[in-house]
């Protein structure tokens, strides 16, 4: 603690992250599980990215967005898990105020990018299935890059806004965060100044970055389902529903966990449920996305096989 009377600056120099478990025996188990999940996530997502880069058949808009999703998944799990593994190894549970802000910024940057990227992927499927004749012109490489660039810009603005707003709050103790990473709901509960403005910003951001994209995704897929049902070929319907079903599964898991985390700001204390949802958001989702979305795809599997046997090269 570094109290500064008469100023509006924080008095907390570091936070104590209570983590997932407190007993030493369980910490060893958690360390092994997290390390395994991290390695699987990195391996799976980098494999997808490599396949998209080297296989000409995968040089299509859908796979361009999938490659970007893989990069996001690697970033999302890297923001939280390596630091947690380090704390488990060193048996230190503290994180500095600046490191906490940095983790918060990058977490919201990547989560916000996820929102917009999933929306762009829904738009891509809408054009491919409902507007096939104009798909190649309306979803050309320039449009793809513009969608990704706009997504990064909006996500960066959102993350920076929340981070700056958090620096205006006073933290004068206690400094124990009942979580395994720094996030807004848990930090709001520790602030000894009013969090109304920060919470208002969070709800506005939720409307812009969660509700609006979710409505757009729902409307897009309503049109997609109507178009798919008009396909006479059973094989064509199956292929279309398979692609759309994978995307909707990812959307459902991502938005479901996000709503649970950020729509419960009125609760007095963080609970173990918040930690479980946090594990889903930062560990399980990035690990499952390659399996749900890409590794079930025969084209991706074929590209990975060629990469492994040396028929394709990254150079």
UniProtKB/Swiss-Prot annotation:
Membrane-spanning ranges: 30-52, 61-82, 104-123, 144-161, 200-223, 241-264, 276-295
Alphabetic keyword roster: Cell membrane, Disulfide bond, G-protein coupled receptor, Glycoprotein, Membrane, Olfaction, Receptor, Sensory transduction, Transducer, Transmembrane, Transmembrane helix
Segments in the Cytoplasmic topological domain: 53-60, 124-143, 224-240, 296-315
GO cellular component: plasma membrane
GO molecular function terms attached to this record: G protein-coupled receptor activity; olfactory receptor activity
Regions of this protein lying in the Extracellular compartment: 1-29, 83-103, 162-199, 265-275
Oxidoreductase is among the record's keywords: no
Biological-process GO terms, alphabetical: detection of chemical stimulus involved in sensory perception of smell
InterPro entries on file: GPCR_Rhodpsn (IPR000276), GPCR_Rhodpsn_7TM (IPR017452), Olfact_rcpt (IPR000725)
Cysteines joined through disulfide linkages: 100-192
Localization of this protein: Cell membrane
Glycosylated residues, chain numbering: 8
Membrane topology: Multi-pass membrane protein
Function summary: Odorant receptor.
Similarity section: Belongs to the G-protein coupled receptor 1 family.
Name of this chain's protein: Olfactory receptor 3A2
The species this protein was found in: Gorilla gorilla gorilla
């Amino acid at each position: 603690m570094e109290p500064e009377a008469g100023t509006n600056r924080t008095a907390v120099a570091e936070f104590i992250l209570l983590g997932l478990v407190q007993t030493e025996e369980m910490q060893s188990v958690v360390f092994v599980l997290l390390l395994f999940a991290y390695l699987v996530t990195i391996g799976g997502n980098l494999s997808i990215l490599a396949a998209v880069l080297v296989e000409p058949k995968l040089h299509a808009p859908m796979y361009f967005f999938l490659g970007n999703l893989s990069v996001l998944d690697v970033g999302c799990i890297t923001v939280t898990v390596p630091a947690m593994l380090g704390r488990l190894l060193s048996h230190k549970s503290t994180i500095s105020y600046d490191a906490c802000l940095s983790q918060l910024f990058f977490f919201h940057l990547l989560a916000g990018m996820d929102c917009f990227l999933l929306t762009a992927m829904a738009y891509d499927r809408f054009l491919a299935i409902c507007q096939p004749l104009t798909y190649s012109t309306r979803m050309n490489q320039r449009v793809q890059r513009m969608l990704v660039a706009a997504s990064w810009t909006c996500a960066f603005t959102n993350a920076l806004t929340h981070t700056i707003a958090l620096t205006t709050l006073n933290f004068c103790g206690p400094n124990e965060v009942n979580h395994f990473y720094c996030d807004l709901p848990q930090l709001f509960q520790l602030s000894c100044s009013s969090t109304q403005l920060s919470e208002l910003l969070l709800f506005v951001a939720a409307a812009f970055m969660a509700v609006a994209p979710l409505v757009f995704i729902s409307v897009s897929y309503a049109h997609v389902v109507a178009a798919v049902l008009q396909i006479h070929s059973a094989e064509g319907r199956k292929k279309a529903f398979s692609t759309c079903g994978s995307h909707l599964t990812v959307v459902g898991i991502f938005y479901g966990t996000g709503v649970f985390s950020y729509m419960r700001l009125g609760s007095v204390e963080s609970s173990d449920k918040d930690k479980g949802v946090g594990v889903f958001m930062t560990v399980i989702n990035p690990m499952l996305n390659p399996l749900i979305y890409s590794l079930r795809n025969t084209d991706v599997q074929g590209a990975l096989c060629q990469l492994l046997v040396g028929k394709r090269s990254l150079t």
